[in-house]
Regions:
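A short, surface-exposed alpha-helical micro-motif characterized by mixed small hydrophobic
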Residues: 171-173
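Conserved ABC transporter NBD signature motif
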Residues: 17-28
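Conserved ABC ATPase "signature" region
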Residues: 28, 80-99
Length: 236
């Protein structure tokens, strides 16, 4: 879950208590020094969070936010950093990347903001990408586009990806292996197809059984009206 993932690179608040063991490429992460964790964050392990507006600075342009990471981790400055930022935006499917560099987060759609977050996560060539419910705040169409993008990046760049989600349909679609967690502990794990076809744990079995299947029964023409709405608007 997100708390476990955040504890991996020491991103929990100071009053959090971390127990157990997390090993990454032979390195013990729980209890590691801030210096060692800082070397891993962004370089080896990057995060994509559920709501990009909570991660992007509303006062800074997209260019500044991407280039800040490039400067901090790679020492890129000026035109070199700008060229790399444009490459990253093109890589994640942002149209008119050069023009978008000067945009601020509020000027982008939800899908575009999430693509910017993915670009920032990829900026320093991480080996592991931790995606925490990255499509929950998006509509179904944009959600599918982001999932396709992540799958494509995983295949082309050889990324390992830890995808945190409660959506079983997404698990089926994107995961090679699945871990089922209850109360912060893994109760079952294995190849996705095997776990879905033959769940073993008493928690996993009803969880998968609750997944909607088939099509709902058609509504009869004579069925009573349950709810109606007129002149309904949604705005942000």
């Amino acid at each position: 879950n997100p708390v476990t993932a955040l504890s991996t690179v020491g991103l929990l608040s100071d009053n959090a208590i971390g127990e157990g063991s997390v090993t990454y490429l032979g390195r013990q992460m729980i209890g590691a020094s801030e210096r060692d964790l800082r070397a891993v964050r962004g370089n080896d392990i990057s995060f994509i969070f559920q709501e990009p507006m909570t991660s992007l600075n509303p006062l800074h342009s997209i260019e500044r936010q991407i280039c800040e990471s490039l400067s901090l981790h790679q020492g890129l400055e000026g035109d070199n950093a700008r060229r790399r930022a444009i490459e990253l935006l093109n890589k994640v499917g942002i149209r008119n990347a050069i023009e978008r560099l000067t945009a601020y987060p509020h000027q982008l759609s939800g899908g575009q903001r999430q693509r910017v977050m993915i670009a920032m996560a990829l900026a320093n060539g991480p080996e592991l990408l931790i995606a925490d419910e990255p499509t929950t705040a998006l509509d179904v169409t944009v959600q599918a586009q982001i999932l396709d993008l992540l799958a494509d990046l995983k295949a082309k760049d050889g990324l390992s990806m830890l995808f945190i989600t409660h959506d079983l349909a997404i698990v089926r679609r994107i995961a090679d292996r699945v871990c089922v967690m209850k109360g912060g502990e893994i109760v079952e794990s294995g190849p996705t197809a095997e776990v879905f076809a033959n769940p073993q744990h008493p928690y996993t079995q009803p969880l998968l059984a609750a997944e909607p299947k088939g099509r709902p029964d058609p509504v009869a023409d004579t069925a009573p009206e349950v709810i109606s709405a007129e002149n309904l608007r949604v705005w942000f």
